[in-house]
Amino acid sequence: MQILLANPRGFCAGVDRAISIVENALAIYGAPIYVRHEVVHNRYVVDSLRERGAIFIEQISEVPDGAILIFSAHGVSQAVRNEAKSRDLTVFDATCPLVTKVHMEVARASRRGEESILIGHAGHPEVEGTMGQYSNPEGGMYLVESPDDVWKLTVKNEEKLSFMTQTTLSVDDTSDVIDALRKRFPKIVGPRKDDICYATTNRQEAVRALAEQAEVVLVVGSKNSSNSNRLAELAQRMGKRAFLIDDATDIQEEWVKEAKCVGVTAGASAPDILVQNVVARLRSLAVAKPFRWKAAKKISFSKCRKSCESIFVKSIKSLAA
């Protein structure tokens, strides 16, 4: 069996930043530290932080007065921010800068009296936070997930309409929805730069190339991770057997026992230790040597972080108008 490792894979800069904020808060203030929603969607990461004293909550009312509160990487609505401000809390914001960019796009549209359409998955915390940035009572904020949703949608003013996207969507699916939006609402305006983050796009490109070589693709990521689910779906659409796994213990021998080539990748919130454990598990099932498949242009983590920060700074300047 040959094992191909997608590159890039695993942690993105926004996830690493969010985890570091929680770790630093624990180191400085000590336990307990309260985190609104799972800081990132990965069971291993969340369990590790919980063991160190992080308490994950969904409602601000669960946080006692005088406590430390951290917003997750997915961002929160303006209503949640206002509620936290009204309490005697010390608040730190771990929202991914690229999610904040989308928040600012929505807030700008709201100020200008434009209506906004968000492409995203209902119920996802990032979507809830982004929808909650719109506050103009005379306008409207709408959520669509598919081209069918677009054709059924009615807005108040088609002349002043813009769209944004959740940052962790499938590039292919989003393209189809955007095409439908432009046909349904010819005057709709999109973001100056694609809202789907570079880490999501790069990892999807890597899986696309990986799936051309591998018979089976294993995606390391939790079930509630949007970007991890999109990676598994992409490989499946390419006709490959693909499985989303939390860790190596999820691997079933029958998945890979006949495979000559197995591809492995990880979602943006999955640490590399989990990938290492998956490789070890595969090697225990067969004589296997892992190869690093350069399925996408390799970008060093430091460059990813600089890119993330650069995009954020440029976005602030462009959206401040």
Swiss-Prot record:
Its EC number is 1.17.7.4. Transmembrane segments: none annotated. It catalyses: isopentenyl diphosphate + 2 oxidized [2Fe-2S]-[ferredoxin] + H2O = (2E)-4-hydroxy-3-methylbut-2-enyl diphosphate + 2 reduced [2Fe-2S]-[ferredoxin] + 2 H(+); dimethylallyl diphosphate + 2 oxidized [2Fe-2S]-[ferredoxin] + H2O = (2E)-4-hydroxy-3-methylbut-2-enyl diphosphate + 2 reduced [2Fe-2S]-[ferredoxin] + 2 H(+). It holds the Pfam family LYTB. One of its GO terms (biological process) is terpenoid biosynthetic process. The keyword Cell inner membrane does not apply. GO terms for molecular function: 4 iron, 4 sulfur cluster binding; 4-hydroxy-3-methylbut-2-enyl diphosphate reductase activity; metal ion binding. Its cofactor is [4Fe-4S] cluster. [4Fe-4S] cluster binds at residues 12, 96, 197. (2E)-4-hydroxy-3-methylbut-2-enyl diphosphate binds at residues 41, 74, 124, 167, 225-227, 269. It comes from the Bacteria. Isopentenyl diphosphate binds at residues 41, 74, 124, 225-227, 269. The active site is at 126 (proton donor). Binds 1 [4Fe-4S] cluster per subunit. Keywords: 4Fe-4S, Iron, Iron-sulfur, Isoprene biosynthesis, Metal-binding, Oxidoreductase. Dimethylallyl diphosphate binds at residues 41, 74, 124, 225-227, 269. The keyword Metal-binding applies. Pathway: Isoprenoid biosynthesis; dimethylallyl diphosphate biosynthesis; dimethylallyl diphosphate from (2E)-4-hydroxy-3-methylbutenyl diphosphate: step 1/1; Isoprenoid biosynthesis; isopentenyl diphosphate biosynthesis via DXP pathway; isopentenyl diphosphate from 1-deoxy-D-xylulose 5-phosphate: step 6/6. Catalyzes the conversion of 1-hydroxy-2-methyl-2-(E)-butenyl 4-diphosphate (HMBPP) into a mixture of isopentenyl diphosphate (IPP) and dimethylallyl diphosphate (DMAPP). Acts in the terminal step of the DOXP/MEP pathway for isoprenoid precursor biosynthesis. Belongs to the IspH family. Homodimer. This is 4-hydroxy-3-methylbut-2-enyl diphosphate reductase. It comes from Escherichia coli O6:K15:H31 (strain 536 / UPEC). The gene is ispH.
